Amino acid sequence: ALDEKSCGGHFFMKQHSVPKFLDNFLTRTLSGTVFSWREILHLTFPNVLDCLSIMFISMLITALISSNGEASVAAVSLVTPLAWMITCIFNGISAGGTVVVAQSCGMKDPVRIRKAAGMTLWLTVAVGTVVCLPLLMFPRQVLTLLYPEAEAVVLEKARIYLSGRAWSILVFTIYTANFGILRGLGESGRCLALSVIINAAYLVFSILFLNVLRMDILGSVFALLLARFIGTAASLILLFFWKAPVKMTFGQIFTGDKGILRSTLQVSIPLGLEQVCSSLGNVVAEMYMISLGTTALATHAIANSVIGVWYSPAMAAANLSVTVVGRCFGAEKYDEAKRYGVRCDQIALILVLLTSALFIPLLPALLGQYHPTPEVLAMAKKLLYW
């Protein structure tokens, strides 16, 4: 029999009393045979906090980097979409694994859960390593090919940042796979804990290397590497050792199953291609933007980091849908899967409206954290308001 703990049961909400009219409304809109409304909300809140913390700390890191000048911000802006495009490839594999793990939970099949978790881990790491090799071996050539018009100082800083970020990606593949497995199991509490650990470490190390030691772009590289090492170690502990939701031996990680592999790739390939195409568009935008100068690149980077926080709660609803819909499919509750997909879209829309109402009045204060020149501040405001 499948232990409730194996699919995140021990993180479900306690039965706190709520007004009857609210309980009736939430039961009609969010409850089903697979999930109660309490379970849906308990999956939603950690996801929102997870995405919000990631984007907020990313915004703070960009603000710290901006204190070293526009060239540093521009260098990070050039590398970020390229690194994200590579990340999207193995992130697609991890997302496919999340769906298969969630389906296995819905089937209440512990053997399949272990097989799906193991395959998600080794496949994500293998694909991530392969696609990262060009960045590790030829960072300068890749940047020169994509951004031939970049200023020399920006290009050199971008080379340092790309090399360091490529090494961090190798470590990050393990974290991404483990995070996807935990999300598929419904372990939202552990996912939130991992996000807090890796992002808090990134922020602390960034303050140390950028503000205290004044190491400029190299400090950002060291901060990212150390944070991802710590996050990866924590993900391994939370998945396999500390009250392990999946009990596996080392050898079981590398077991193969054609059916599970096929199911994983059926989700991973279209999802990965969609994300890669989106990221490729950002790379192309940077290629055209480079001719506008370093100031334009810095403005774009600052505006992007702010808008990432703005939309992060809505992104959480998309993450929620992967677990919820996947679990319903595994339980063969296809009508509920469709209904929960619509509900996740509605939750995303509500969150976008709420964050818009909150963030628009706060934009001047948020932009002030970047120490921008008056020109950059004016351009960033215009971009964000439009």
Locate the predicted segments by residue.
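Membrane-interface helix-loop junctions in multi-pass transport and translocation proteins
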Residues: G189, N199-A233, A365, Q369, ...
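Residue-level recognition of transmembrane alpha-helices
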Residues: T44, S77-T80, T124, L162-R165, ...
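Alpha-helical transmembrane segments of multi-pass membrane proteins
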Residues: A150-Y175, P374-W386
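Helix-terminus/linker motif at the lipid-water interface of multi-pass membrane proteins
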Residues: M55-A74, L143-A152, L208-M215, V276-V309, ...
